[in-house]
């Protein structure tokens, strides 16, 4: 189906409607699963030697020193323009402001007299950040991951990226307080972070995007007892735009294309009650597409994308909630009024002047977001992902005495005798003291 084909939602059967919102398949092939499993086991067994072999095989790079030196990082920064460094600093300032505001206040309450309950927050001790390489290094992801890690107070923050690591990535890592950087990419980097090697430290939790092999490696290590936790399930990028008759077609088209250029498996959807706007957006997409260096990639993504005409904006919101997009852009005259009705989205962009690019780089929100429908149960990345919450309780003698019979009754009902005894013994001890 061509992206300039308008689809009348209300003329479609329920089966057709479900098909329109179906995402491209992303399940890992058996060969990827087996290859990744072998890589994980090899890195765990052979450490740095395996990492160097995989760099030569996959990255076509002979790596002598896996760890990047401070001198190399300084040299990378010197090669960058002041304009870019200033832009990174400005972005980090906004990211810091937004994520610092997410700090949870401690909870300290008496649930009843003499029964004190608390919730306290602690940082994840060590985290590993994975940043893909390639022709367009995602240094902005360094800002999005390393900044909240620093605010959270993570004691060890390390980064892996395929060699040779781009200057922008090295500078961004230094700017955000990353302590160690390693010339390691792919599934082997995930293995090194999960299990540790002679050079790369083992971490508690791994963050960051990647290709099918990286995604599968993260999935596998998260399910191994000797592995590591991960940030969230990953899938292709996606955007859904809700537009009304007052939307600017060129703006809408540019937002759709900014997502489509990410990769051929990205998906973009336009929902609008105005067929004329849909037609104008399709025309604007074609005009802008002709000027994009990554036009071939974007065109492939558009083949799985949709222009859908609805009855009204309320129906647009209902369809969006059903789909649960990673990015939701609302270009309507009442954009703010629609927010309360949105139930599933990774990040929402309101009005004509809030392009997705703002959140991708510098507004302050995090651009690491749940995709592939995981917005139904997962949140956008934030400070809490680099922290853990712990509860504390303390009962005075009087508080314990008042609660004892309740605990004994509940424990007896569950036939957990030792639980009941732990209370009864203390009750008897208090009676003896009286």
UniProtKB/Swiss-Prot annotation:
Task: Name the Enzyme Commission number(s) assigned to this protein.
Answer: 1.1.1.23
Q: What is the effect of changing residue 327 to N?
A: 500-fold decrease in activity
> One of this protein's Pfam families, by short name?
Histidinol_dh
Detail which positions bind substrate: 237, 259, 262, 327, 360, 414, 419
Q: In which pathway does it act?
A: Amino-acid biosynthesis; L-histidine biosynthesis; L-histidine from 5-phospho-alpha-D-ribose 1-diphosphate: step 9/9
Q: What class of enzyme is it?
A: oxidoreductase
Keywords, A to Z, come to: Amino-acid biosynthesis, Histidine biosynthesis, Manganese, Metal-binding, NAD, Oxidoreductase, Zinc
GO biological process terms, semicolon-separated? L-histidine biosynthetic process
Where are the active-site residues found?
A: 326-327
Molecular function terms, GO-annotated: histidinol dehydrogenase activity; NAD binding; zinc ion binding
- Quote the record's cofactor note: Binds 1 zinc ion per subunit. At high pH manganese can replace zinc.
- Keyword Nucleus set for record: no
Outcome recorded upon mutating residue 262 to N: 7000-fold decrease in activity
Q: Which cofactor does it need?
A: Zn(2+); Mn(2+)
Record's GO cellular component, any one? cytoplasm
Residue numbers binding Zn(2+): 259, 262, 360, 419
Relay the activity regulation note. Answer: Activity is lost when the metal is removed through urea denaturation or chelation, and can be regained by addition of metal.
Q: Where does NAD(+) bind?
A: 130, 188, 211
Q: Which reaction does it catalyse?
A: L-histidinol + 2 NAD(+) + H2O = L-histidine + 2 NADH + 3 H(+)
Summarizing the function annotation, the protein's role is:
Catalyzes the sequential NAD-dependent oxidations of L-histidinol to L-histidinaldehyde and then to L-histidine.
Q: How does it assemble?
A: Homodimer.
| Protein family according to the UniProt entry | Belongs to the histidinol dehydrogenase family.
Q: What is this protein called?
A: Histidinol dehydrogenase
Which organism is this entry from? Salmonella typhimurium (strain LT2 / SGSC1412 / ATCC 700720)
Gene label:
hisD
């Amino acid at each position: 189906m061509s992206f300039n084909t308008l689809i009348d939602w209300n003329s479609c059967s329920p089966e057709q409607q479900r098909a329109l919102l179906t995402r491209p398949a992303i399940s890992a092939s058996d060969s990827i699963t087996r290859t990744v499993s072998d890589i994980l086991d090899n890195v765990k067994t052979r450490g740095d030697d395996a990492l160097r072999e995989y760099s030569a095989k996959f990255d076509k790079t002979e790596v002598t020193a896996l760890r990047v030196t401070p001198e190399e990082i300084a040299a990378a920064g010197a090669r960058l323009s002041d304009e870019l460094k200033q832009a990174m600093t400005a972005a980090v300032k906004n990211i810091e402001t937004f994520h610092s505001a997410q700090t949870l206040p401690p909870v300290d309450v008496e649930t009843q007299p003499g029964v004190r309950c608390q919730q306290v927050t602690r940082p994840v001790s060590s985290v590993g950040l994975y940043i893909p390489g390639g022709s367009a290094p995602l240094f902005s992801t360094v800002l999005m991951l390393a900044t909240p890690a620093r605010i959270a107070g993570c004691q060890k923050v390390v980064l892996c990226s395929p060699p040779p690591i781009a200057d922008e990535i090295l500078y961004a890592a230094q700017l955000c307080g990353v302590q160690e950087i390693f010339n390691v990419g792919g599934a082997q980097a995930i293995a090194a972070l999960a299990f540790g090697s002679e050079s790369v430290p083992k971490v508690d939790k791994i963050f960051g995007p990647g290709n099918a092999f990286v995604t599968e490696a993260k999935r596998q290590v998260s399910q191994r007892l000797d592995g590591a936790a991960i940030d969230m399930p990953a899938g292709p990028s996606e955007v859904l735009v809700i537009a009304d008759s007052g939307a600017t077609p060129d703006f809408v088209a540019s937002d759709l294309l900014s997502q489509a250029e990410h990769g051929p498996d990205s998906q973009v959807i336009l929902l609008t009650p105005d067929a004329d706007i849909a037609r104008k957006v399709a025309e604007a997409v074609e005009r802008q597409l002709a000027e994009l260096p990554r036009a071939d990639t974007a065109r492939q993504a558009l083949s799985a994308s949709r222009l859908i005409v609805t009855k009204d904006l309320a129906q647009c919101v209902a369809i969006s909630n059903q789909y649960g997009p990673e990015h939701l852009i609302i270009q309507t005259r009442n954009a703010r009024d629609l927010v309360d009705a949105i139930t599933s989205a990774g990040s929402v962009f309101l009005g004509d002047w809030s392009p997705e690019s703002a959140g991708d780089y510098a507004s302050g929100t995090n651009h690491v977001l749940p995709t592939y429908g995981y917005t139904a149960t997962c949140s956008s990345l934030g400070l809490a992902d680099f922290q853990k919450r712990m509860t504390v309780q303390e009962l005075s003698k009087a508080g314990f005495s008042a609660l004892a019979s309740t605990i004994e009754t509940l424990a007896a009902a569950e036939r957990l005798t030792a639980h009941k005894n732990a209370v009864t013994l203390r009750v008897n001890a208090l009676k003896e003291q009286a």
